[in-house]
A protein has these predicted regions:
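TRAFAC-class small GTPase G-domain
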Residues: 1-182
């Protein structure tokens, strides 16, 4: 019977003390966007991730925050959809494969093109340099330079090096995201 009252109390508290955040996860193909969503929702990383077609939507509860997460495909034919799924969100997460430095120029172009859309004015940006468990990955200062993050004005911008596979730095990423909740 005490379990019933505990559940009732948790449900009731959630009505008054819970927060929400809507997040869009974008980036070039094979950067780790879906792995990011999978790891934060289930705590599990898998090598067998099917490329996203168009988008996936997930709701994830972490502590007292419920995240509505748009995982948007990164292939060139889907990039024109990014703005639609970033409109009205509390934060944009841009995932970069930090081991594939040949794609940094393309990633920079796509990121700045997205952020120049008037509908995204002021939306906080979190850049994740994924795959830091692999030798030769670019450190944060290289990501900041290559993606020209210092040129981004009028919005909070943060950049972290992380690994979905080892879950390195995902705790601080989740703290950052929770800070965008309301």
């Amino acid at each position: 019977m005490s379990g019933f009252f505990t559940n009732l109390f948790q449900w009731f508290s959630g009505l008054f003390f819970s927060k929400k955040a809507e997040i869009s996860v974008v980036g070039l193909q094979a950067s780790g966007k879906t792995s990011f969503v999978n790891v934060i929702s289930s705590g599990q990383w898998s090598e067998d991730v099917v490329p996203t077609v168009a988008f996936n939507l997930r709701k994830v509860r972490k502590g007292n925050v419920t995240f509505k997460i748009w995982d948007v495909a990164g292939q060139p034919k889907f990039r024109s959809m990014w703005e639609r799924y970033c409109h009205g969100v509390d934060a944009v997460v841009f995932v970069v494969d930090s081991t594939d430095q040949e794609k940094f120029e393309s990633a920079r172009f796509e990121l700045h093109s997205l952020l120049n859309q008037p509908a995204l004015s002021g939306v906080p940006l979190l850049v994740l340099g994924n795959k830091n468990d692999i030798d030769g990955h670019a450190p944060v200062n290289e990501l900041i330079r290559s993606l020209e993050l210092s040129k981004i004005q009028g919005r909070p911008v943060s950049c972290y090096s992380c690994s979905m596979k080892s879950q390195h730095n995902l705790d601080i990423v989740m703290q950052w995201l929770a800070g965008r909740s309301h």
